């Protein structure tokens, strides 16, 4: 005989599935910069770069999992949108750094 499927059993199954998905392809969480010391621009930029690379790798891993049929479309879209946002931020920072460098070069001594 078939057992009656309750909404509680379905919810528990969905929660377990989501937990597994989250653990499998979770983007790298931003790590806190250690306080108490002298925090320089270089250490902040290094941390931001590391976080962006982790996000891009998570998006790539989600795409590969989707091609293998292991990942839902919704999760892949979320990971890729997060990766796209990280890439756009990196490009914007690069553009600002180049612009600042060009301004310094143009300064008269």
Swiss-Prot record:
This is Flagellar hook-basal body complex protein FliE 2. It is found in: Bacterial flagellum basal body. Belongs to the FliE family. GO terms for molecular function: cytoskeletal motor activity; structural molecule activity. The keyword Transferase does not apply. Keywords: Bacterial flagellum. GO terms for cellular component: bacterial-type flagellum basal body. It comes from Bradyrhizobium diazoefficiens (strain JCM 10833 / BCRC 13528 / IAM 13628 / NBRC 14792 / USDA 110). Pfam families: FliE. One of its GO terms (biological process) is bacterial-type flagellum assembly.
């Amino acid at each position: 005989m078939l057992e009656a499927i309750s909404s509680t059993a379905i919810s528990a199954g969905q929660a377990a599935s989501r937990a597994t998905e989250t653990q499998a392809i979770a983007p790298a969480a931003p790590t806190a910069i250690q306080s108490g010391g002298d925090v320089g621009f270089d250490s902040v930029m290094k941390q931001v770069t590391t976080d962006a690379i982790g996000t891009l790798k998570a998006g790539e891993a989600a795409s590969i999992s989707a091609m293998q049929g292991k990942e839902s479309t919704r999760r892949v879209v979320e990971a890729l949108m997060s990766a796209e946002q990280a890439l756009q931020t990196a490009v914007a920072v690069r553009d600002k750094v180049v612009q600042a460098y060009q301004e310094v070069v143009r300064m008269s001594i």
